[in-house]
Amino acid sequence: ANTPMDQNSPEDIFTLGEYLGREQYGTRPLFYGQTYASKPALKEVDGGCVYDVTEGAPVYQRKEKATPDEKDSYEVVRHKTDYKYAQNMLFPRMYSDAHAQAYEDWLGGIKGVQVPYDQCGQMVMVKVPTQWDNIKFFFIYQLNYMYWRYFMWNFAGRQNDIQGQGEIEHGNWITGIPFVDKFLVGDQSLLPSDLKNNKGHNVFYCLPLILGLIGLFWQAYKTKRITTPNGEEIEEPVGIQQFWIVFFLFFMTGLAIVLYLNQTPMQPRERDYAYAGSFYAFAIWIGMGVAGIAQWLQGKLGEKPASVIATVVCLFVPIQMVSQTWDDHDRSNRYVARDFGQNYLSTVQEEGNPIIFTNGDNDTFPLWYNQETEGFRTDVRVCNLSYLQTDWYIDQMKRQAYDSPAVPIEWSRLEYVQGHNEGVAVRPEV
């Protein structure tokens, strides 16, 4: 439809596949692949050394018509290629050479092992992490810091809402129980007032966690008394099948995502939102925890009193959570992002078809919100430099958007479309 907001412009089956497959973000090794210290595999070709690559699936694209009456067709513009590496390991968790120092920082140093590397006839030694180093990073960072920390934020407590990169005073999980927190992250009473009074400082005393664990075990071991054909009464397990349904919902929307994302250190923002589904699944067990407590009380108090007491007592858990989190989850009167974007747009001249160049999400989205939602300064053309290297975004820049005329780009589409002019010789004689 060529709307002003048209990310990746999925207009045919191939571009739609790339869009849904998030191919613009690249790939990461999951089961077998390189380490951050691995060297590319080399091979000799015609007496020279070249990188050894694997040619993958073809990339199709709608062929650009030279004339309007030319028939629609698709062409292969390139093949996906994967570089081969000389050093590989199973289940690679430390694979990004851009984060080498961060990997070592998280592990407090890496033992590593020296392995030989044939550099086209010249044998050199390369230090790569061991499998144990790799597994330690998986547990310390990817599981503990990038999943269980977020999980405990929701069901035990949160230190503050300042983004953490492993610091002891930023963004950790706590309980609100002093001696436990002292063991986890040190004496919290020694923190400066701005951290102690941070609105994101929420303590639940692990009550939601405990209630959820009660529900988990109650569901898994729930039985039902039945009478066999020969008149014998037995306890038949009825909860375990239901337990596995909730468990796999919990696993597939939480830990399985951790395995798939294979995240690197120094993430640009907290990623708790990626695992919200598993937190919802655990909330099912919290609800079942109330039923488990009620059933336990029934043997002592009777059915109705047990249900009332269990409900009233357990109601204090969500009340405690609301009392702690309302102030930092209340989104009313929060206009920083809106005002940020509006201030940017307000400073742009009103005459001469203005263009504002941005770089990255945080610069761009507040501007888009103001234009798309509030209709503010739709005469300004927002041009994201991060996208400008793609053909679909150049197409958008060449079209009118609201009150902003097309950007005066004079190239024909054949000159910048994918598969054409991807390497431009500035010195042909070289």
Residue ranges and their predicted role:
Residues 1-275, 281-353, 358, 364-430:
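ER/secretory pathway lumenal C-terminal domains and tails of membrane proteins involved
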